[in-house]
Amino acid sequence: LKCHNTQLPFIYKTCPEGKNLCFKATLKKFPLKFPVKRGCADNCPKNSALLKYVCCSTDKCN
């Protein structure tokens, strides 16, 4: 699986074994949905008071 791991959409990395999801975190209160964090995960992170997480399982989907 290949996931973006920076705020720039053309930079990505291959996820290590066992991390089968890509995630993208955006600020909940910010009108533009600019990603503040991206990467690989084994489980989808839980949303927090400030961040909304979206997970997916195909190459470069985040």
UniProtKB/Swiss-Prot annotation:
Disulfide topology: 3-22, 15-40, 44-55, 56-61
GO biological process, one term: killing of cells of another organism
InterPro entries: Cytotoxin_Cobra (IPR003572), Snake_3FTx (IPR003571), Snake_toxin-like_sf (IPR045860), Snake_toxin_con_site (IPR018354), Toxin_cobra-type (IPR054131)
Superkingdom of the organism of origin: Eukaryota
Tissue: Expressed by the venom gland.
Keyword set includes Disulfide bond: yes
GO MF entries: toxin activity
Compartments (UniProt record): Secreted; Target cell membrane
GO CC field: extracellular region; membrane; other organism cell membrane
Keyword list, A-Z: Cytolysis, Disulfide bond, Hemolysis, Membrane, Secreted, Target cell membrane, Target membrane, Toxin
Coiled-coil annotated residue ranges, if any: none
Signal peptide: none
Gene3D superfamilies on file: CD59
Pfam families: Toxin_cobra-type (PF21947)
Entry's family note: Belongs to the three-finger toxin family. Short-chain subfamily. Orphan group XV sub-subfamily.
Its job: Has low cytotoxic activity.
Extra information: Is classified as a P-type cytotoxin, since a proline residue stands at position 31 (Pro-31 in standard classification).
Protein name: Cytotoxin-like basic protein
